[in-house]
């Protein structure tokens, strides 16, 4: 499958052949894409929510009042879950929300996400993702030429430092090396910009 190579000025400068098994899958599996996104989001959760149990709450262990003769329900501790200021029963604990997902499924998810963007015409190949200076205003003017609301930029094995610094202060613009390419960011952003180097490395990686 052939597609245009664009410059950062959004002008056609050549043509590139994309591997159809990676960028033009015939049937897009939305279920696989969702599965990978759910796996990513669960893995990203910190899981540091926690409440104190009866044994962890600070306070006295003294019996609040005698067992019989007061007319009240019997109580053994002021730290019990039914008492104000007591512990919490079955509350959230510190844990990992991460689940397991086979590498083959994760790889398939990336392939189908790239194919979906390509089918929508929102995957663009750029000849070079390099800037002379780390100027945000320069990069904003460049991205405005593509008329998109959000951009996920994937470079080769290394990201240009000037491009990376310029993109830091731009809302909904993320730049990563090819190893950082992921399903969630591909789907979340309107446009995916790939450098020529990123295309060749991704094709080798996902083959």
Swiss-Prot record:
Q: Name one GO molecular function term.
A: rRNA binding
Q: InterPro entries, per this entry?
A: Ribosomal_uL4, Ribosomal_uL4-like, Ribosomal_uL4_dom_sf
- Asked if Disulfide bond is a keyword of the record, the answer is no
Q: Which UniProt keywords apply?
A: Ribonucleoprotein, Ribosomal protein, RNA-binding, rRNA-binding
Q: Does the keyword Metal-binding apply?
A: no
Q: What are the TM regions of this chain, as residue ranges?
A: none
Report any one BP term from Gene Ontology.
translation
Q: Which GO terms describe its cellular component?
A: ribonucleoprotein complex; ribosome
**Looking at the Swiss-Prot or TrEMBL record, what is one Pfam family this protein matches?**
Ribosomal_L4
Known partners and oligomeric status = Part of the 50S ribosomal subunit.
Q: Which family does it belong to?
A: Belongs to the universal ribosomal protein uL4 family.
**Function in brief:** One of the primary rRNA binding proteins, this protein initially binds near the 5'-end of the 23S rRNA. It is important during the early stages of 50S assembly. It makes multiple contacts with different domains of the 23S rRNA in the assembled 50S subunit and ribosome.
Q: What is the designated name of this protein?
A: Large ribosomal subunit protein uL4
Instruction: Read off the lineage from the record.
Output: Bacteria, Pseudomonadati, Pseudomonadota, Alphaproteobacteria, Rickettsiales
